[in-house]
Curated annotation (Swiss-Prot):
It comes from Bacillus subtilis (strain 168). GO terms for cellular component: plasma membrane. The gene is yngL. It is a multi-pass membrane protein. Belongs to the UPF0713 family. InterPro entries: Mycophage_PG1_Gp7 (IPR010773). It is found in: Cell membrane. This is UPF0713 protein YngL.
Amino acid sequence: MDRLSFLTFIMLILASYRLTHLIVFDKITEFIRKPFMKKKRIVDQNGHVDEKSVPASNFGYMLNCYWCAGVWCAILIGLGYLFLPRIAIPLIFILAIAGAQAILETAVGVGVKLIDVLKSLQTMMNDKKS
């Protein structure tokens, strides 16, 4: 690898982001995380019982930690790009598109919520003036 173009670098970042999110958060990969998690009962001051999933091992912590999994996903994506480009590049391309889409979807969702909040504030201000 002599030079890495800016576009390729951005695609590697987006692919790593999406793979990390897929492993740590997405419902579709819950079956991967589940064997490494255990249920823990938590009782609050009022006596309410809640059940929470916590990592059962160091590997469980890695699968549950965005920062930890992110490092390993970046290593996997980077090594795949360098040593198995015929296999890795199509996967990187797909993951990069999905990663960019996820970021855009989040931005749109935040924007829609912000608009709703601003409309509510405007309505409250108009009601106070009346």
